[in-house]
Amino acid sequence: MANSDSPEQNENHCSAINSSIPLTPGSLPTLTLSGKIRVTVTFFLFLLSTIFNTSFLLKLQNWTQRKEKRKKLSRMKLLLKHLTLANLLETLIVMPLDGMWNITVQWYAGELLCKVLSYLKLFSMYAPAFMMVVISLDRSLAITKPLAVKSNSKLGQFMIGLAWLLSSIFAGPQLYIFGMIHLADDSGQTEGFSQCVTHCSFPQWWHQAFYNFFTFSCLFIIPLLIMVICNAKIIFTLTRVLHQDPHKLQLNQSKNNIPRARLRTLKMTVAFATSFTVCWTPYYVLGIWYWFDPDMVNRVSDPVNHFFFLFAFLNPCFDPLIYGYFSL
C-alpha cells in the first residue's frame, strides 16, 4: 500500500528526524533468511514476467505484420497490448525496486529518486488495475450493447487513454509525501540509517488514513467491484438470450468464428478477474491488517509476511499466460 504507518510511529519518527537518537544493532532492520528467499523469488518472478509479457508483445507485433498494412489491431488485441505494456511496466519497476530495497534494507539513492521511484511504483500498480477495468467494461458493453460499441470505434481508445491518465494523476501525491529521513546516534561515530518513507507528510493521522483508504479502494476494491459487476451483466445477458431462444446455443458450437470468439473473450475476462482476486487479496489483506493493527508484525512470522506479499507479483506473470492461451 502507499503508506501503512500508524499514528504513533509517524509521531515518533517525526520527532526523531531533526534530532539524534541512539541506534543499536538490534533496533535496525536487517536482511533475514526469509528476506533473502523473498529476494530470490522476486527476481525469479521478474525474469518470468519479463519473458512472458515481452514474448506476447513480440507475438502480437508479428501478427500485425502478417496482416494488411491498412488493417488496424482488433479492439480486443489493442486492449491486450496495453494491458501487457502495463504489466511490463509493473514488472520492470516494482519487482527490481522491491528486490533491491530488501537487499540494502535502507535507502541509498537520495531524495530525488526516493520521490520519483515512489511515484513510478504506484503509477505502475494503478495502470494494470485500470486496464483490467477497461477490458471488463469493453467486454460487458460488447455483449450487452453491441450496436452502440460498434458505432463508436473511438470508445476503446478513449478508455485506454483515460486509464493511463488517471494512473499518472492518482500516483501524483507520491512525489510530495515521500522523502528521506536520516537517523544517527549521539556520538556521530556511525553512518546512521537512511530511509525513503512518508513520515511527517500528513498534518493529521486521519489524512494518512484517508490516503491509504483511497489508494486501497482505487487499486483493489473499485476495480474488483467493476469486474464482478461487468462479468455478472455478461452472464445475465447471455443467460437471458439463450433462455428466450435456446437454438442460439448452437451458434457457440458451430463453425462460426464470431460466437466462438465472444465465448473465448468471456472466458478470458473471467480468468482475468479470478487472477486479479487470487493474486492481490493476500497482499491487501495483510496491508489492511497492519494498517489497523501495526503490532501484527510481531505476531505474524516473517516468512508468512514475505509469502503473502509475493502473491502480488504473480499477477503480471499469470496475465500473459491467460491472454496468450485465449487470444492467439
Swiss-Prot record:
Gene (name only): GNRHR
A Gene Ontology term for the protein's cellular component: plasma membrane
Glycosylation sites: N18, N102
Protein's GO biological process: cellular response to hormone stimulus; G protein-coupled receptor signaling pathway
Source organism phylogeny: Eukaryota, Metazoa, Chordata, Craniata, Vertebrata
Chain segments annotated as coiled-coil in the UniProt record: none
Entry keywords, A to Z: Cell membrane, Disulfide bond, G-protein coupled receptor, Glycoprotein, Membrane, Receptor, Transducer, Transmembrane, Transmembrane helix
Subcellular location: Cell membrane
Protein name as catalogued: Gonadotropin-releasing hormone receptor
SUPFAM superfamilies, sorted: Family A G protein-coupled receptor-like (SSF81321)
